Amino acid sequence: MTYTGLMQASLDSGNIQDGSYIFEKMKDICAPNLVTYNIMLKAYVDHGMFREAKELFEQMLENTNHLSRNDDYKMRVIPDIYTFNTMLDACAAEKKWDYFDHVYQRMLYHGYHFNPKRHLRMILEASRAGKVTFLFFFLHIMNDPL
């Protein structure tokens, strides 16, 4: 059985602490891949552990700051669209609009784009919370042909 399988089994049974422990121990033996990071991130979010999810996400973002050679892509895990969507959902659920903006800006920086079906609900929630700049920014994006 793999570390990811053990971690997933712990998380599926609702045991976040054991899943997190396995994830951390895995780093001592082998490098977790993107799927493993996303599984752990989603588990933190699903169990209301926003701070832990944010820390893990920031670790992934930090990895992108250390990419200088092609070989670095094999050793470091960088966020994908699933990672960004998971964090955007978490920010919206927790009403962390300033961090939502940070995550969204990083998503754009990494080459992922606004998805009206996926993100519009969150943008409207942010604008209702007084983050009017989000609404204007996204309306501009939607009206700006590529």
Spans of features found by a protein language model:
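Histidine (H) residue identity feature
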Residues: 47, 66, 102, 110-113, ...
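Intrinsic low-complexity, intrinsically disordered segments enriched in polar/basic residues
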Residues: 64, 134-145
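The core hydrophobic/aromatic register in alpha-helical repeat solenoids, strongest
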Residues: 6-14, 20-26, 41-48, 54-60, ...
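Acidic/polar low-complexity surface segments
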Residues: 60-68, 72-74
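Pentatricopeptide repeat
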Residues: 3-4, 8, 19, 33-38, ...
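Inter-helix linker motif
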Residues: 14, 29-30, 48, 64, ...
